[in-house]
Amino acid sequence: MLVSDRDKLEDKALIPLDNIFHNGKGTLVQASVTSVEKEKTGGFVVLDNGEKLPFYVLVVATGSKWSGPVDFPSKPEDVTKWISEQRKKFKDAKNIVIAGGGSVGLELSGEIKDIWPEKSVTIVHSQKKLLNSVYPDKFRDRAAQAYRPRTKLVLDDQIPGELTPGATSVTTRNGKTITADLIVPAWGNKPNTALLSSLKDVLSPNGCVKIRDTFQTQAYPDIFALGDIIDVNEQKQAGKAQAHAGMVAANVLSYVQGQPLKQKYKGSYELIVITNGKNDGVGYFGVWWGIVIGGWLASLLKAKDLMLPATRVATGASK
């Protein structure tokens, strides 16, 4: 969607939230939470418009903050302009350097090469293998095998900063000069938890929320957290957040009814499918001996529709 207007993905990926509540039983407030004011029981969330909303139970699912093209503006009216600006950058560039060889950087490179095979794309990654050490070497090697035919890989190296305006190349930390007229940051996400910074003993040093196995924060039993922001040793993915949500909902109901919280989170196995354009990709399922897939199967699972129909249904929108 950010690379080109092919397939008009914005028509499917930008999902309205007017049907988010089942049977319409809920109120949607479109605003940003700037802080949380805690009282002995419950408290208030403070909005950027100055309004305060009281809560008896608070669930925080604010997700991640990103850099680069996926750092979307907060105001809906600015998103379309942002998308157009990013597309122009990719269209005009001839030599693209992606800083980061995780799933975002890999999928971005595949999309670029699908649309513009003639463009030069280089991924610079700080580790000796693509992705990270959560995944076994056999999967990381398979990823390199899949992407190397179309994309240059510079491993165990880093891009020290942004491209100087008018520059035609960038020099890596190890002194390698790479021709570039566009550098795209793709080095991962950070938890979007600034709104909780005023509360004591809620955040870990890494900015994630310290939780119990019931998803309650360690400091406050009436504040729950889930998704990318929790301090749990697992890869941050939308699929995991969906699994968290069902458990949190059950525990919140138990909490307000004064019942024991029975849903206890013990983590999950790692699963990832990474597209390499529309017709290729790689995947890993962390069950049994660790299953690695590639090619047509990875494409079938994700590349054709990016799982957007399922996401739309889950948020109350039509396919």
Curated annotation (Swiss-Prot):
It holds the Pfam family Pyr_redox_2. NADP(+) binds at residues 129, 188, 265. It is a single-pass membrane protein. The chain crosses the membrane at residues 281-301. It comes from the Eukaryota. The record marks 125 as: 4-hydroxy-2-nonenal adduction. GO terms for molecular function: electron-transferring-flavoprotein dehydrogenase activity; flavin adenine dinucleotide binding. One of its GO terms (cellular component) is cytoplasm. InterPro entries: FAD/NAD-bd_sf, FAD/NAD-binding_dom. It is found in: Membrane. Induction: Expression is positively regulated by the cross-pathway control WD-repeat protein 2 (CPC2) during fruiting body development. NAD(+) binds at residues 129, 188, 265. Its EC number is 1.6.5.-. Probable FAD-dependent oxidoreductase that plays a role in the regulation of fruiting body development. This is FAD-dependent oxidoreductase FVFD30. It comes from Flammulina velutipes.
